[in-house]
Amino acid sequence: MEEGDFSGSEPSEVTDGQNTNTTMTTETHTTTEHQPKPLVVRLLEVHNCDEDEEDEEEEQEEDHEAPKTHKSHEASVSFKSVNSSDSPKASDLPLSCKASDFLGSSKASDPSESFKALQSSESQEDVKDDLFSNAVIRTSPSLMTGYPPQLQLTSLRAHPATRDLVKKCFYSRKRVQDLSRPKKQWGTPDRRLFWGNQEPIRPVSEAALKAPSSKRIEDLAQPRLVSRHYVPNRVQYYYSCGRDSVIWEIPPPALITQPSKRIQKLAKPNRFKTQSLINRENLPGTLRYSDPSPRILRLSIAKGTDPNYIPPKTIQTKISFSTLSAVASPRIVDLAHPRIKIEGLCYERERSELPIRPVAPAALLANPSERTIFLAKSKRVHEDYLPVRDARWPISYAATHPQVSERIQELANPHTRSPTHVVYYDPDVFKVKPSALKAHCSNRVKELAEPIVR
C-alpha cells in the first residue's frame, strides 16, 4: 500500500430508511506531513464558539431529523479525529463546544451528576441508532492513518471516570513493579558492615560535629610513641573489631633462659603487707601471736628411724662380670633365631593323609614309655559329678500325662479364713504337738532334704 492512497479522501455517505437518498460528502485533507493544532489554539476556538451556542441550538431544533442523524454521526467521526484534522468545518464547532461545556459542567458539579449526564447522552445515541438501523458509515483511510496511537485529551475530558482509571493505573505501575520483586531475607543488611560505616545509635548533634577540638584533645588523639628498640612479636591491630585475636608466640630463648635471683625474689608473694608489719607493734596483747610452747616444738621435730628397722631387699638382680663378658657360640645364636614358617602359618602338605605340621621320622618310630602312656590318658570324672544341665531338656511322659489325686485337689483349694468382723484368738497357735517333738525322720526324708550337687 503506497502513501498516495492515503493522501486522497473518500466520501462518507449516510442513507436513511424512508426512501430518501441524501448524499453528503465530507472531505478532510490529512497527511503525514501536517501536524495537529496546538492545544492553546484549540482552547481559544472552543472559547469563541461558546458565544454562538444559543443561536446554533435554535437552528438545530428546526432542522429535519435526517440532518440531525447526519450531524450525530459526523460528530462521532470529528470527535475521534480532532487532533488529525487541520480545518474543521462549521458543523463541527457546536459539537466541540458541547464537549467543552460538558467538561466544565463535570468540573463544577459532582462526579455522580457528570456520570448521569454521560449515561443520558449515550442513551440518546442508542435511540438514534435504533431509528436509523440501515445507515452505513464509510471512513476514509487517511483518517485511520492520521489517528495517533496515544490517548487523546478530548477523550479524557469527555469521560472523567476513564481519566481517573488511567491515572490510577499509571501511578500504580511502580507499586506493581516493587511488589513483583522477590522479598529480601529478614536480617540481612543491604550492604556489608565494616568498622566505621555504621550509623550511630543516637543522632549526633550539629554542634558536636562543628565543635573545635582543644589542644589537649589533639594531644590525646596522637598515637603513643613506640621505642625504636621495641620489636613486636605479634600482629599489631589498632582496632580488633571484626578481627580474630592473635595469641602471642613465645620465642625459644625465653623458654631456655633462667631468671635471676632478683626476679625470683620478686616473684614470691609477700606473706604480710608492709603496712601490716609497721602497725603490728601497736596491736593489743590478745591479738599478738604467742611464742610456741615446748610441746609444740617437740612435736615439730620429725621422728627418727628405728635402729632395728631392716629396709626391703632390692629387686635388682646382680649379673656377674663373667656372664656379661661371655661370648655365645654359633649354635646358641642359631637357636636364638625364631623358627621360620613356610607360607606364613601353614606348611606344605605332600599328601592329604599327612598332618598339617610335618612329624619327624624318628618321632614316628619312637616307643613311648609307661610314664608317657599314663600321662597321655585323660583324667576321669569324679563319681558324684553331675554334668551341667542343658537349658532345654526333654519332659517325661509322666509329667505330660499326670493324674491328680484327691489329696492334691484338697491342697489346691485356697485356705478359708474367718471373717474379719469376728475376733478369734487361738491360744495354741505356736504350740508344737508332742508327737512332732518325738518324730524321727527317715533316711528317705534326709536324702530329699539335701540339695542336689551339680
Curated annotation (Swiss-Prot):
- Please list the residue ranges that the record marks as compositionally biased, kind Polar residues: 9-18, 106-122
- Where are stretches of biased composition, namely Acidic residues? 50-64
Q: Which UniProt keywords apply?
A: Repeat
Comp. bias (Low complexity): 19-29, 76-87
Q: Does the keyword rRNA-binding apply?
A: no
Start-end of each THEG repeat: 167-185, 207-226, 253-272, 286-305, 322-341, 362-381, 398-417, 435-454
Cited Pfam families: THEG
Q: Where is this region: Disordered?
A: 1-129
User: Where is this chain compositionally biased, Basic and acidic residues type?
Assistant: 65-74
- Protein name stated in the entry: Sperm microtubule associated protein 2-like
